[in-house]
Each structure stands twice: as C-alpha cells, then as structure tokens.
C-alpha cells in the first residue's frame, strides 16, 4: 500500500511552525499571497531558525505571482516546492522551474473542465493540488468538492507520473471518506486549526486515521 503524504498548509506563526514540525506531516506550506494566512519570507526565516526542519519539506504557495516575486522568496528560504495556485499557464510554470530549479506544483480548481485543464500541464507540473472552486477565493476556504471526482484526477496524475494532492474542507471527521479514494497526498489548512491556530490534537487525529487506513489497506474502487 503506497503511503499518503500529508501537507499542513497556511502556517502563520512561530507556534504554528513548531507544532507542524513536531507533527507527522511530510510538507509544511506557507502562503505568500493575499490571504488571512499570508506570511512574509522574513517571518518564515525567523520561525524556521527556532527549530530543526528534520526531513520535512517546505512548500511556498503563490497566486499569479511574477517569476521575480517567486524567485525573491526562494532565494531567502530553503523551499523544496513552489505551488502555483492561480491562473498560471504551462509556459509560466516552465519559466518558474527554470528560474528556481525547484519542483513546481499546479493547483487545479475542481469544475467540469478541470481535468482537461490538468492535461495541459503534462510534462511541466511536478505535482498537482486539486482544490475546491469557491468564488472570490483561491484556497483555504474549508469547503470540499465532490470527492467522487478524485479517481479521475489521480488517474491523470499517474499517467503524467506525478503525485496528486487533494485539498479543500478536509477534517478529522471526514478524512476517512477521502482516504477511501487512495489519494497520493492530502493538503489541509483550516481542518487542522482551532480559533485560527494550528491544533496538534487535530493533526494527531488526521495522522492516526491515515495510519489506520494504510494498515488496513482498504480503498474504494
């Protein structure tokens, strides 16, 4: 049974970072765009200096940012992945990859045309995050999409040879339903928060349910 990778996104304080670093997450995400979870490279650099990164990887999330803006952040922080969460084109992703020499993931917002959109990034995107489409917001909404569509996204990502994370409205209460579809990764922000702060108890619930699922090895067809 393949592992399910966990990404805890939207870390926005020293406490959030310490909690996430102590967790079982594989990736820590930071939002470098207009958002209630927006952070600056300077803040993140300071928080990371207070603790050991260990084997966790860092993801920087950007929305329609210029390559210069992205490169400015990657030069200041030891990011492993750049996540483009807006309307960036395949050509723009290629430029970001060339400039940063990092893995670049593309967010795909679920709708009837999303699968065709995903196919356009084949050979360019190093991974995908499929998120809910919510008017006026790019992500971190706490809203999930119809997970019956998940297998189609996973199949396309597998065809391209890259991982596919699922995001949007995932909580300790519903993660088992999502795990049944065998996603490559799960991207959580609001679902691991209490009163706007990362909650280690919710993280532990997420991790325990994921481990239980992997141990049993069950999944939807």
From Swiss-Prot:
Superkingdom in the source lineage: Bacteria
Q: Which GO terms describe its molecular function?
A: phosphoribosylanthranilate isomerase activity
| Entry keyword Cytoplasm | no
Task: Report the EC number(s), separated by commas if there are several.
Answer: 5.3.1.24
HAMAP family attached to this UniProt entry: PRAI
Q: Which InterPro entries match?
A: Aldolase_TIM (IPR013785), PRAI_dom (IPR001240), RibuloseP-bd_barrel (IPR011060), TrpF_fam (IPR044643)
UniProt protein name: N-(5'-phosphoribosyl)anthranilate isomerase
Substrates-to-products reaction catalysed: N-(5-phospho-beta-D-ribosyl)anthranilate = 1-(2-carboxyphenylamino)-1-deoxy-D-ribulose 5-phosphate
Q: Which organism is it from?
A: Geobacillus thermodenitrificans (strain NG80-2)
Gene encoding this polypeptide? trpF
Q: Which NCBIfam families match?
A: PRK01222.2-1
Q: What processes in GO biological process is this protein linked to? A: L-tryptophan biosynthetic process
Q: Does Nucleotidyltransferase appear among the keywords?
A: no
One Pfam match: PRAI
Please report which protein family the annotation says this sequence is part of. Belongs to the TrpF family.
């Amino acid at each position: 049974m393949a592992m399910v990778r966990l990404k805890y996104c939207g870390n926005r304080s020293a406490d959030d970072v310490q909690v996430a670093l102590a967790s079982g997450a594989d990736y820590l995400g930071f939002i470098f765009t207009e958002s209630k979870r927006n952070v600056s490279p300077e803040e993140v650099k300071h928080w990371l200096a207070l603790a050991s990164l260990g084997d966790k990887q860092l993801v920087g999330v950007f929305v329609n940012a210029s390559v210069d803006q992205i490169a400015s952040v990657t030069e200041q922080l030891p990011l492993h992945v750049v996540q483009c969460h807006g309307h960036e084109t395949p050509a723009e992703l290629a430029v970001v990859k060339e400039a940063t020499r990092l893995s670049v993931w593309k967010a795909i917002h679920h709708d009837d045309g999303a699968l065709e959109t995903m196919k356009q990034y084949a050979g360019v995107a190093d991974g995908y995050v499929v998120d809910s489409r919510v008017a006026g917001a790019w992500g971190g909404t706490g809203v999930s999409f119809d997970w019956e569509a998940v297998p189609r996204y996973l199949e396309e990502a597998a065809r391209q040879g890259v991982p596919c994370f699922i995001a949007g409205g995932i909580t300790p209460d519903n993660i088992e339903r999502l795990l049944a579809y065998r996603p490559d990764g799960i991207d959580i922000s609001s679902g691991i928060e209490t009163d706007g702060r990362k909650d280690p108890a919710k993280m532990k619930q997420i991790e325990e349910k994921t481990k239980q699922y992997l141990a049993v090895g069950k999944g939807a067809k």
